Amino acid sequence: MLEQMGKAAKQASWQLAVLSTAKKNQVLSVIADKLEAESEVILQANEQDMEQARASGMSEALLDRLLLTPARLAAIANDVRQVCRLNDPVGHVLDGSLLDSGLKLERRRVPLGVIGVIYEARPNVTIDVASLCLKTGNAVILRGGKETHHTNQATVKVIQQALEQCGLPAAAVQAIESPDRALVNELLRLDRYVDMLIPRGGAGLHKLCREQSTIPVITGGIGVCHTYVDDSVDFDKALTVIENAKIQRPSACNSLETLLVNRNIAAEFLPALSSKMAVVGVTLHAAENAMPMLQDGPATVVAVAAEDYDDEWLSLDLNVALVDDIDQAIDHIRTHGTSHSDAILTRSLSSAEHFVRAVDSSAVYVNASTRFTDGGQFGLGAEVAVSTQKLHARGPMGLDALTTYKWIGYGDDLVRS
């Protein structure tokens, strides 16, 4: 089955690679229109998935990721239209030169070919990934989790109808519908057809892909994100940033999970933090050194467990620990971080610069919320993933990350001497 899908995707990718930008934008516009026209069907399919997820005891954090609402679906359709407005990187000449031999050489962006994406309870990923792949002339094979089975079926059907309406093969966007996990292992070895694999899920999925795939893998998306509060901060401004990073969307991979506070301000800052978090319903998981200043505050507080520092809460929970200085904060991030998004709140330029240089994450912020790590916020349009590795993409992966380049040489019946 996957052999046939891979072959069809590869053949479709050859057609996509030579499409004009106007034609690709036409396809995306039709997809956006059809998402709105078929919204009732898609939302009904999503409700089937939600009912099954609730019955299985899925956590509130994951239920929120799975849920599609009319507003969320409309936003997804608008994201597709935003991709239409983005510059098409395909065909862009990165650099060029005229060599002594007379050969005119240029390096030009081209599609990767066929992308494989494995993801879990995130129905928006189907549309986000498909739109970015189509804009860059790539075919895609999607393998969503069983939690999103009905939603993915409905959305992929809409995309394939749009492709055929525009005279393009439906095989440009395909989904593996069977929940059989053996098919994941088969996909990981489909290197004859698939050029890059992107897993979007938990640590177990990432480990499986790294160990078993014969296809280049881009991993990321696991976000144990930190914010360090320096002793020079304005309390009110710092608390506003912390609140945004934690509660705007707790289930997102760029939400704040661990707060590191400079010991010099702890006696004043932690009670203020407790008051702020109590209002928004955040439970504080306090380190032993922070507990005395939090236990009598209005926020719910429990003792942090050692393993809490290494896991995503994805909920209204926040680890809080005191550090002696910026270097101890950096050491903590190096030990427990996932190279996703980390921030410093400070009024010291030297501290800010030291933090930026020393913290080796895909996104590092000074006096800003970690919630900004997002393709839309970065001006990249919808993102295919957030890469926490260094090759070949890092951070939110927009259009450029779905391309490679080829060398093109022009001569006048030129031969090498």
Curated annotation (Swiss-Prot):
Superkingdom, taxonomy of origin: Bacteria
Catalytic activity: L-glutamate 5-semialdehyde + phosphate + NADP(+) = L-glutamyl 5-phosphate + NADPH + H(+)
Pathway: Amino-acid biosynthesis; L-proline biosynthesis; L-glutamate 5-semialdehyde from L-glutamate: step 2/2
Annotated keywords: Amino-acid biosynthesis, Cytoplasm, NADP, Oxidoreductase, Proline biosynthesis
GO molecular function: glutamate-5-semialdehyde dehydrogenase activity; NADP binding
EC number: 1.2.1.41
Keyword Lipoprotein: no
CDD domains named in the record: ALDH_F18-19_ProA-GPR (cd07079)
Cellular component GO terms held in the UniProt record: cytoplasm
Any one GO BP annotation for this protein: L-proline biosynthetic process
Location within or outside the cell: Cytoplasm
Matches recorded under InterPro entries: Ald_DH/histidinol_DH, Ald_DH_C, Ald_DH_N, Aldehyde_DH_dom, G-glutamylP_reductase_CS, Glu-5-SA_DH, GPR_dom
Broad class of where this protein is predominantly found: cytoplasm
Pfam family, one: Aldedh
Function recorded in the entry: Catalyzes the NADPH-dependent reduction of L-glutamate 5-phosphate into L-glutamate 5-semialdehyde and phosphate. The product spontaneously undergoes cyclization to form 1-pyrroline-5-carboxylate.
Protein family (similarity comment): Belongs to the gamma-glutamyl phosphate reductase family.
Protein name stated in the entry: Gamma-glutamyl phosphate reductase
Organism encoding this protein: Serratia proteamaculans (strain 568)
